[in-house]
Amino acid sequence: MTRYLTLHSIEEAKSIINESLKKLKNEVEEVDLFNAIGRVLAEDVFSNIDIPPYDRAKMDGYAVKAEDTYEADEDNPVELKVIGSLKAGEIKDLEINNGECVEIATGAIIPKGANAVVMVEYTERDNDRVKIYRAVPPMENIQFTGSDIMAGELVLRKNTKLTPRDIGVLAAIGKSKVKVYKKLKFGIISTGNEIISPNEQLEFGKIYDINSYTLVSYIKTLGYDFEFFGIAKDDKEELKEKIKKALKCDIILLSGGTSAGVGDLTETAIKELGGKILVHGIKIKPGKPTIIGKIDNKLIVGLPGYPTSCLTIFDVLFGDEKNVVKAKFPVRYISAKGRVEYLPVILVKHKNGFSAYPITKGSGAITSLSEADGYIIIDENKEILENEDVEVHLFGDVKVGLNIIGSHCIGVDIILKEAKLLAKTINVGSLGGVLSIKRGEADIAGIHLLDEKTNTYNIPFLEKYKVKDAVLVRGYIREQGFMFRKELGFKSIEEIIEHIYKLEFINRNKGSGTRILFDKFLKDYNINPKEIKGYNIEAKTHSAVATAIAMKKADIGLGIRTVAEQYNLAFIPLANEHYDFLIRKERFNDEDVQNFIKALKTAKLPFKKPDNCGEIIWGG
């Protein structure tokens, strides 16, 4: 089988999808108003009646002739005769003359002769007489016929997606049924020998089905229906049987099985069922191996198996148009060769607008999208320069809260939980945190930067990078050292040095305090980094380092004791380090920042707290 013989443009793929959707979406059905929420109107809706259909009282009180009240005030009330009462829904032949009034309830019909309502709060009743303590002008507290909606008025337009408020309008004009476009129904099939349902016991080599659940959720937010046909193993006949059952739906979605490799059977199954392949391969990252085909004129789309690729392609092909905001891109970035890249980003709001931080975990990480506020579209073979303007296509509303950008530490999560704060945490390393404070993006940056000359933490770097308008708050002391699996049996730093060129390392990202500490260690012991296996393999968090070691992807790496213990790894200490918090002065007195500092002092942390924890140690 030829692998991606012709890569199609995104526009070509979307054109095929839109052509099919246009035909399907033109089918109309009539539904009960109780079932109309989220549906799309297939016609303009006009009102046949006035709303309200009669003049009615806005308040409880007394229907009066306004001119009878003109002399009334708190010291000189006007006294009127009460000739009757009206409740909402009551119809009585009442007509008031000068010097008379009618007791009236909210929503009741205004009696003949009345042109205003005095609120009950400004009256005093005595049998069939009432004192009025406030004058009212004509039309006061009356809602007149057709003042909300007039007969013949267009109330909702064709193609409106019905909200609860729209349903209320339809009910108000007497519509019990409404014509809407027929709901599209998606048939969903997951594929792969490794895929199991989330309710099953996870065995080695298996992964839980993510794509079915994310696709169903997205489909429902678009107002469509679905039917799940289960998980198909990498067996052609089993896949064909599930596809045949799914053909009762309008559109069939398969996830996985599109990469044209061993066990990727989607294209073969479609062809053997008499179908036609329209697209196999799109110039997009992520999602290159996408398949679009037809069986019996039913659209069938093979989505990539990686969660981010799968959801991104579905969003591009079927999603609603996104709102767009402009932002600065804080780092240099080179896009994929020959493909348009949809790069997920986290938005950080600051005084000059937004900055868009890229999420580069890869298409296999579901958190790439769960953490993202939106994505930027990068043309093929394009380089984005540092601080270049970009357009961010939003998934929804931009999340608000503290912007915490800097070095990863589980202590930050504990503090946020203790303070019950909403925050975005972006792990870019300590130096990245310092620079984000300088750019005005971060509110707080966790840093632990060891200066080789003075052998002290953080303050020398703030002076070196000429940080202004910020304060450094003392945090806590973490124990950094080597994490490794217990069977390796090392007892000392000297033993690690003795075997260092035989071990497979996993390193931290450039600019992180841990990376700086590791490089200093290598320099102090005259160890050549180029001869360290895995020196250039980088992880962005202590947890990622520990995971790689626990899963035997690496033998050893530098991290904090707390994380080593969490992953049941051995630990040999290398240094005690100060993990402090750099905070912008303009945000220092904000309630959220002060609550963060308070929680820093009070939270039970797995680290040593110095006596001046939570106090300003620089820049005050």
UniProtKB/Swiss-Prot annotation:
Which Gene Ontology molecular-function terms are recorded? Answer: molybdopterin molybdotransferase activity
What Gene Ontology terms for biological process does this UniProt record contain?
Answer: Mo-molybdopterin cofactor biosynthetic process
Answer yes or no on keyword Membrane.
Answer: no
The answer to whether UniProt assigns keyword Metal-binding to this entry is no
Q: Which GO terms describe its cellular component?
A: cytoplasm
Transmembrane stretches in the record are: none
Keywords carried by this UniProt record: Molybdenum cofactor biosynthesis
PROSITE patterns associated with the record: MOCF_BIOSYNTHESIS_2
UniProt pathway annotation:
Cofactor biosynthesis; molybdopterin biosynthesis
- Which residues lie in coiled coils? none
Name a Pfam family for this protein.
Answer: MoeA_C
Entry similarity comment: Belongs to the MoeA family.
What name has this protein been given in UniProt? Putative molybdopterin biosynthesis protein MJ0886
